[in-house]
Amino acid sequence: MTIAAGRMPQRGWFDVLDDWLKRDRFVFVGWSGILLLPTAYLSIGGWLTGTTFVTSWYTHGIASSYLEGCNFLTAAVSTPADAMGHSLLLLWGPEAQGDFVRWCQLGGLWAFVALHGAFALIGFMLRQFEIARLVGIRPYNAIAFSGPIAVFVSVFLMYPLGQSSWFFAPSFGVAAIFRFLLFLQGFHNWTLNPFHMMGVAGILGGALLCAIHGATVENTLFEDGEQSNTFKAFEPTQEEETYSMVTANRFWSQIFGIAFSNKRWLHFFMLFVPVMGLWTSAIGIIGLALNLRAYDFVSQEIRAAEDPEFETFYTKNILLNEGLRAWMAPADQPHENFVFPEEVLPRGNAL
């Protein structure tokens, strides 16, 4: 008897690498991991290095590291000096010329952290796409994560690209971000920008929806156990649901007169509201990068200038913004040597 055995198909290096990347292990790597893991490691490592050792004396004229006496809230990896423009500040570039200490002094770590951080976030979104495809589910998690990516890219990259240099981007630190928020308000009147309003509505609306949803599910859990702790009344692997959508619908119908009729619409709405808030915020920041104006109620400003007794919350905020600019410009940009004469400083009841 003759047995014919076929030859095993020859596997190329791509197939071998694909199998290794997608192997079932504790931490999934995948093709997205080639981008995510090194960039995330380098950006986090760069931030820890900068906040621990690197000064901002040469870029902002301030201390910004633990080594200089800062704490977690005041330490930061600060933006490059204004004179650097939009240079990528490569270690081997014409600015640092391979000198690591000089590179840190010029603000090279900020560009390093910002660019690697952006690619790390994109890699994390691609990771969610990849795992969703392998598991066989829809990629809505990745689509939702596009919101934080849009905000990061618009704030840390697009905004300074629209300004004169990386100097005007936020530095990577808690107090540094607060300073950037004050800067946006003083120079762009950001809180009166409609895209900021939509962003606030989306983020706070998403938090409200999350709280309501969690409370409603807890409220309508089946009473299928005698224990006071509801988590002891079910098995994590059971097939049947442990709460009543019908009861939840009835409850909210009595509260508001309307309620979500099915889970698909409910959860899509919970996805849509915060993600749209993040996207509209990102669009607004790109508008600020181009120095587009927010709402201007010029008639109120003219009347307030003519009538000392007329004042609105808008005109008070305009005066406050002028005060922010008059203080922040010389303090934040000492290299410009700004000097404001007394007659141009803001006056009025607001200050």
UniProtKB/Swiss-Prot annotation:
<dbReference type="InterPro" id="IPR000484">
    <property type="entry name" value="Photo_RC_L/M"/>
</dbReference>
<dbReference type="GO" id="GO:0009772">
    <property type="term" value="P:photosynthetic electron transport in photosystem II"/>
</dbReference>
<feature type="binding site">
    <location>
        <position position="128"/>
    </location>
    <ligand>
        <name>pheophytin a</name>
    </ligand>
</feature>
<dbReference type="GO" id="GO:0005506">
    <property type="term" value="F:iron ion binding"/>
</dbReference>
<feature type="transmembrane region" description="Helical">
    <location>
        <begin position="39"/>
        <end position="59"/>
    </location>
</feature>
<keyword id="KW-0472">Membrane</keyword>
<protein>
    <recommendedName>
        <fullName>Photosystem II D2 protein</fullName>
        <ecNumber>1.10.3.9</ecNumber>
    </recommendedName>
</protein>
<dbReference type="GO" id="GO:0031676">
    <property type="term" value="C:plasma membrane-derived thylakoid membrane"/>
</dbReference>
<keyword id="KW-0408">Iron</keyword>
<dbReference type="GO" id="GO:0016168">
    <property type="term" value="F:chlorophyll binding"/>
</dbReference>
<feature type="binding site">
    <location>
        <position position="213"/>
    </location>
    <ligand>
        <name>Fe cation</name>
    </ligand>
</feature>
<feature type="binding site">
    <location>
        <position position="213"/>
    </location>
    <ligand>
        <name>a plastoquinone</name>
    </ligand>
</feature>
<dbReference type="InterPro" id="IPR005868">
    <property type="entry name" value="PSII_PsbD/D2"/>
</dbReference>
<keyword id="KW-0460">Magnesium</keyword>
<keyword id="KW-0560">Oxidoreductase</keyword>
<keyword id="KW-0813">Transport</keyword>
<feature type="binding site" description="axial binding residue">
    <location>
        <position position="116"/>
    </location>
    <ligand>
        <name>chlorophyll a ChlzD2</name>
    </ligand>
</feature>
<dbReference type="GO" id="GO:0009523">
    <property type="term" value="C:photosystem II"/>
</dbReference>
<dbReference type="GO" id="GO:0010242">
    <property type="term" value="F:oxygen evolving activity"/>
</dbReference>
<keyword id="KW-0602">Photosynthesis</keyword>
<feature type="transmembrane region" description="Helical">
    <location>
        <begin position="151"/>
        <end position="164"/>
    </location>
</feature>
<feature type="binding site">
    <location>
        <position position="260"/>
    </location>
    <ligand>
        <name>a plastoquinone</name>
    </ligand>
</feature>
<feature type="binding site">
    <location>
        <position position="267"/>
    </location>
    <ligand>
        <name>Fe cation</name>
    </ligand>
</feature>
<feature type="binding site" description="axial binding residue">
    <location>
        <position position="196"/>
    </location>
    <ligand>
        <name>chlorophyll a PD2</name>
    </ligand>
</feature>
<keyword id="KW-1133">Transmembrane helix</keyword>
<keyword id="KW-0157">Chromophore</keyword>
<keyword id="KW-0479">Metal-binding</keyword>
<keyword id="KW-0148">Chlorophyll</keyword>
<dbReference type="InterPro" id="IPR055265">
    <property type="entry name" value="Photo_RC_L/M_CS"/>
</dbReference>
<feature type="binding site">
    <location>
        <position position="141"/>
    </location>
    <ligand>
        <name>pheophytin a</name>
    </ligand>
</feature>
<keyword id="KW-0249">Electron transport</keyword>
<dbReference type="GO" id="GO:0045156">
    <property type="term" value="F:electron transporter, transferring electrons within the cyclic electron transport pathway of photosynthesis activity"/>
</dbReference>
<comment type="similarity">
    <text>Belongs to the reaction center PufL/M/PsbA/D family.</text>
</comment>
<comment type="subunit">
    <text>PSII is composed of 1 copy each of membrane proteins PsbA, PsbB, PsbC, PsbD, PsbE, PsbF, PsbH, PsbI, PsbJ, PsbK, PsbL, PsbM, PsbT, PsbX, PsbY, PsbZ, Psb30/Ycf12, peripheral proteins PsbO, CyanoQ (PsbQ), PsbU, PsbV and a large number of cofactors. It forms dimeric complexes.</text>
</comment>
<feature type="transmembrane region" description="Helical">
    <location>
        <begin position="206"/>
        <end position="226"/>
    </location>
</feature>
<comment type="function">
    <text>Photosystem II (PSII) is a light-driven water:plastoquinone oxidoreductase that uses light energy to abstract electrons from H(2)O, generating O(2) and a proton gradient subsequently used for ATP formation. It consists of a core antenna complex that captures photons, and an electron transfer chain that converts photonic excitation into a charge separation. The D1/D2 (PsbA/PsbD) reaction center heterodimer binds P680, the primary electron donor of PSII as well as several subsequent electron acceptors. D2 is needed for assembly of a stable PSII complex.</text>
</comment>
<keyword id="KW-0604">Photosystem II</keyword>
<feature type="transmembrane region" description="Helical">
    <location>
        <begin position="123"/>
        <end position="139"/>
    </location>
</feature>
<dbReference type="InterPro" id="IPR036854">
    <property type="entry name" value="Photo_II_D1/D2_sf"/>
</dbReference>
<keyword id="KW-0812">Transmembrane</keyword>
<dbReference type="Pfam" id="PF00124">
    <property type="entry name" value="Photo_RC"/>
</dbReference>
<feature type="transmembrane region" description="Helical">
    <location>
        <begin position="277"/>
        <end position="293"/>
    </location>
</feature>
